[in-house]
């Protein structure tokens, strides 16, 4: 507790010492500035007294004594601020110039440089000086700046309303008809393994089945046995190019023939298929061959039903 009290006393004492030092420095500086301000005022007052003495001395009388004038200076009110002198003076640190008696105070020329006027103390009375008002200098008008010419507003032309484009009607294309479904029914008549079909016998059996030699140098079975009407199915050589030459059939041999029918065709395709199967069996019996399917395998009842189903599917799809 004592240590805290001692520390507080030391701090308070240090603050008091610093405050005293600051106050002493401030007081000394204030007195010094007051001394310098009083010097020019005393010098101006003495100069003013000499001028008044010269004005008061008139021509001497017969007795050599002039009239004595007593001038009283009206004390300035204490509350009114002292007027600043209107004459130029030298600062206290400038060298003094020899004073010359003048009758009338010469109006000082306005100084170009800005200089702070000393402030007179309020406690010292001072005789009011006549204030001469200088005639206001006519201010020269500033040269008029040429006005910037603003461009004349251009008339805003609104674009003419464009007609809205009329959408051309898109021609609605008719739905494309589905392509008709097609299929080809193929069966073969072939000789037994290692043998050939004789051309002369083959030619006679083909004619007996109602085929007629025609386009593409192959035989065709028409609606009528005499070769008239639309083609129902056709017969070609199993060996490429698949054509025949009726003039040389006597010396002609082949491993087999191919009978094919395109579906859809003319009339009832199922009836045409039955006629085609009968023709193949007749030729096979005449030349001593066998009837094969499109894979050149032995014809079976299952394969025949498959052919018939394919024909029905095409007819229903194209129905």
UniProtKB/Swiss-Prot annotation:
Membrane topology: Single-pass type I membrane protein
Superkingdom of the source species: Bacteria
Subcellular location as annotated: Cell inner membrane
Species of origin: Cronobacter sakazakii (strain ATCC BAA-894) (Enterobacter sakazakii)
Keyword Cell division: yes
InterPro entries assigned to the protein according to its UniProt record, in alphabetical order: Cell_div_ZipA (IPR011919), ZipA_FtsZ-bd_C (IPR007449), ZipA_FtsZ-bd_C_sf (IPR036765)
Stretches of the chain found on the membrane's Periplasmic side: 1-6
Family: Belongs to the ZipA family.
Cell division as UniProt keyword: yes
Biased composition (Low complexity): 73-86
Pfam families xref list: ZipA_C
Function recorded in the entry: Essential cell division protein that stabilizes the FtsZ protofilaments by cross-linking them and that serves as a cytoplasmic membrane anchor for the Z ring. Also required for the recruitment to the septal ring of downstream cell division proteins.
Transmembrane segments: 7-27
Residue ranges with Pro residues bias: 152-168
Cytoplasmic side: 28-319
Single GO BP term: FtsZ-dependent cytokinesis
Gene3D superfamilies according to UniProt: ZipA, C-terminal FtsZ-binding domain (3.30.1400.10)
Annotated Gene Ontology cellular component terms: cell division site; plasma membrane
Protein name as catalogued: Cell division protein ZipA
Compositionally biased spans, kind Acidic residues: 50-65
